[in-house]
Structure formats: structure tokens, C-alpha cells
């Protein structure tokens, strides 16, 4: 795996999607850090903070020689909100949704020892078709419209620049927010792994592969010892004397499903627990659970909503300090690394979709009818 995080070239664009040629260097580019929001990285100007429309990133990429003969994939943890990605001017990926990962197979375009130009454009505009939602693109961000007709108000409207009018109560940070990596797999590879454990120790699994190589799975305990195994792409295996996952002050015990398929290997950690609602109670592993927790954001000074492992560790330690056991990902899916950390540290997670602001009842109609 090759990290592409670090300093990239950056330029603000307009609302025109194809303003710049992705095969050429960006004009008047400035340095920008990735992963991070671009909004707060230059205090000498308000242009980044107030930007409305497309923003452009670039960097050169060289594939190491040891990747020869492998499948090569370019992966983004998230780009907010809409992303277009090019290699040497060729469009390789488009993605909508600023809080989920996406990737592209670039094996045919990226060869060992060759340097190519990677260009990313991201659009921060929100409207009735985006998540989270906002008002229509291009509306003026002037909130004194109730005073229509007053000369000073009308003059302010005419002078106002188009801006986002989000229907949510947090800043609309934008940019390449989570890690960017190149990774390799064999030509025949493990595509997906599903693990569904039960508190009686049975584990249903399903492995999706791209080839015909046999699949072997092994369950490892927290010390790395094999406790169960099976052959085949799907089935059920049983963990003897299973340890259940519990939030602190209990033990957040984790197992690992070790999957092999030909030359490819994948490890998926998992905890064994059940959760259900019975009447007015939430039961974890059949026992009443009392939630003590927090809502939080990924925002922080300077890097905005950019992925920060230090901040994640600090937040988890604050949750422990408060003797809490749960966190709500208000108001969008967080970085995958945060969920892994909560699994390890015994923190329950209430995971949210980024659908804040849609509303209910009649307020939903504009979103249903949006073309």
C-alpha cells in the first residue's frame, strides 16, 4: 500500500465542472494538505472559507517497481461532496457523497516506474439532491429576504456572491477529507468478506472472490491463536467457549477472520455480541444496557473535517475519562478507522447516514420530487 497523503497542488475553481484541463498543471496553484478540508488552511484570505463550487487538487504519482504484475487500485477515503478523478487527463472515477470511500482500478493506466498526473476536482455545493441537503444551487446567501423592497437590503442582495445555504447546523467543510492510497492485489483477489456472528459462538461467513482459487478461513482469538477453521467461500463455523464483546468497563473482545484465496490474504476483525430492543429496553447480549455517551463531529481547527488519528485517540480517551460507553456519529458516517478504534476500545457506535436536514412530512416533498 502506498500513501498519497501529504502536500498537493490546489486551485479554487468556479461552478463550471470542466473549468481546468485535468491533463495540465493547475494555474496559479498553491500548496494544500491532504487529508484535510481546504477551508481553513490559509488565513490570509477568506476565499477558501467562503468558496462555492469546484476546487481542484493535483499531484504526481509514481508506481514502485515491486507492484509489477499486480492489480493496482486507487482508493479515496472520502471527498466532499462530489468528486471527479483523472489520471493523465483520463476520467477514472466519479463519486457523489462526501462521507463514504470509493476506488478505481487503475492497472491499465499506471505502470511501474512511470510517473502520471493525478487530478481531483471536488464540488462543495449542496442542494435537494445531495446528502446532507441544502437549498438550490446558485441561490444568494442573503438571509434578510423578509425585508424585500428596502433599498439597502436589495443592494446587499445584488452584491452578495452565490454561497451554499445548507439545511444543517454545522459548517460545510469540503475537500479530500480522508486518506488516499494506492494498493495492490493479485490478479485473482478477495473482493468482499461478510461476517455475521451469534452469541452461541456460530459465525456465518461469505467471501466473494474474482477467481476460482479455493477459499480457506480461520478464526483467530485475541492472542492470534486459531480456534476454528473452514474451507469454502461461505458457510458456518463455531467458536468454542466464545468470548462476547462488551463495552467498557466490560471486555471488548475481538476475533479475526483470516481469509486466504490463492495468493491473496485478508483479515477482518469482529466482535461477538447481540443487540435488540425489547419494550423500552435496549439489550446487549441479552442484558439491559444503559447508554452513556456523546454526539460529536469530526471537525477540528485548521484541518476541518480531515482525518486525524491523534484527534480520534484523544476523543476516545475523553469518552473513557467521562465513563461513557457510546458515541453517535452526528451527522454522517465517520472514517472507517474511527469505527475500528471504537471496536477495540469498547465504545458502542450509533452510526448515522448524512441525511440531516431532510425533515419529515410535507417538508420531504421537495426532495422526493427533485429530478
Spans of model-derived segments:
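Aromatic- and acidic-residue-enriched carbohydrate-binding clefts of CAZyme catalytic domains
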Residues: 292-297, 351-371
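Secreted/periplasmic carbohydrate-active enzymes, especially glycoside hydrolases
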Residues: 1-336, 341, 345-349
